């Protein structure tokens, strides 16, 4: 009998020893898919966050860049990944534009939304020698001159910064198509065009122009935020500059494939919240002019719905909406 009892006890102990680690989550590395190239804005935010995230989780967090198709390749990879909690993604505003533009049948509705990690605001930046000293002067000129007289850039046609520019004009009761949009491969080439006089303004983020602003080669006339930016305290908001409400920012968000286990999701969400609040993560982002953000449960879902609707309205005004 004693042998049987000891054997049973050993069996039970063995079961607990096996079942404990098998149910621990996470127990292996986690990957975050970034739809944009290494060294870009989204990549920088995610790598900064990932360093804190792996400290909180106790397992490695690997950042994987899946580029191509204007972000479609990477966003699709996130959507189609196994929903086991070990593959997450970094979504950007473009996924809220694809379906309206008709470029891909994917949207934020296809993802489990955790939270935004950070934002960088759009702005209106001109060359240092531009005749426009204020946004009010620039808007008045766009209003009074023929369509195409003034131009902007910052991304491709229908991209995030194009939406920022179109929304600004619509808020000022100006046909968004009056402003000529010059496609570019990003902020750097667009800012070169601004400084050379090739285009009137840059409606991407002043964060992308930070070194040029500090060198006095460009000026930011306004930021597209509800309140002034800590990074650019001298730049008025659109409301302050022209008396109209318009805000727009690029955001970088933590997401997962649909269908992730609720318990695993909660573990990841709580760890991610702690990671984003870590002093070294906050300071590293702020040093780059990036504003850290963390959404309460459900808050990002509401934001995403509002963002998608607002962007669709602007794209319709620009004559770019296909759906």
Q: How would you name each of these model-derived features?
A:
Residues 6-19:
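Bacterial N-terminal signal peptides
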Residues 1-5:
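Positively charged n-region of N-terminal signal peptides that target proteins for export
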Residues 208-277, 306-309:
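C-terminal lobe and pocket-closing loops
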Residues 25-27, 115-119, 245-249:
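Short, flexible turn/loop "capping" segments at secondary-structure junctions
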Residues 77-86, 99-189, 238, 251-284:
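Hinge/capping helix and adjacent helix->loop/strand transition within the periplasmic-binding protein
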Residues 27-29, 262-323:
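An extracytoplasmic/periplasmic, membrane-proximal ligand-sensing/linker region
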């Amino acid at each position: 009998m004693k042998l049987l009892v000891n054997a049973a006890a050993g069996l039970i102990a063995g079961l607990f020893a096996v079942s404990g680690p098998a149910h621990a989550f996470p127990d292996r590395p986690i990957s975050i898919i970034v739809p944009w190239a290494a060294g870009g804005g989204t990549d920088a935010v995610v790598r900064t966050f990932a360093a804190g995230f792996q400290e909180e989780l106790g397992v490695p967090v690997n950042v994987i860049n899946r580029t191509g198709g204007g972000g479609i390749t990477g966003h699709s990879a996130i959507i189609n990944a196994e929903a086991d909690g070990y593959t997450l993604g970094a979504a950007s505003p473009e996924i809220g534009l694809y379906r309206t533009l008709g470029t891909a049948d994917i949207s934020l509705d296809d993802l489990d939304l955790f939270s935004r990690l950070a934002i960088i605001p759009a702005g209106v930046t001109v060359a240092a020698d531009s005749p426009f000293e204020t946004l009010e002067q620039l808007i008045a000129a766009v209003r009074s001159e023929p369509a195409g007289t003034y131009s902007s850039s910052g991304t491709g046609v229908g991209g995030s910064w194009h939406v920022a520019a179109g929304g600004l004009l619509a808020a000022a009761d100006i046909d968004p198509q009056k402003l000529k949009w010059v496609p570019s491969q990003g902020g750097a080439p667009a800012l070169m065009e601004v400084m050379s006089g090739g285009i009137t303004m840059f409606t991407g983020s002043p964060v992308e122009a930070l070194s040029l602003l500090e060198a006095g080669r460009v000026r930011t006339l306004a930021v597209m935020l509800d309140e002034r930016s800590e990074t650019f305290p001298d730049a008025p908001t659109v409301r302050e500059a022209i008396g109209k409400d318009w805000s727009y920012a690029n955001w970088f968000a933590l997401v997962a494939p649909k269908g992730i286990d609720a318990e695993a999701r909660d573990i990841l969400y709580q760890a991610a919240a702690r990671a984003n609040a870590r002093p070294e993560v906050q300071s590293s982002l702020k040093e780059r002019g990036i504003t850290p953000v963390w959404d309460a449960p459900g808050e990002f879902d509401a934001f995403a719905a509002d963002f998608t609707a607002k962007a669709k309205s602007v794209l319709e005004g620009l004559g770019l909406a296909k759906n």
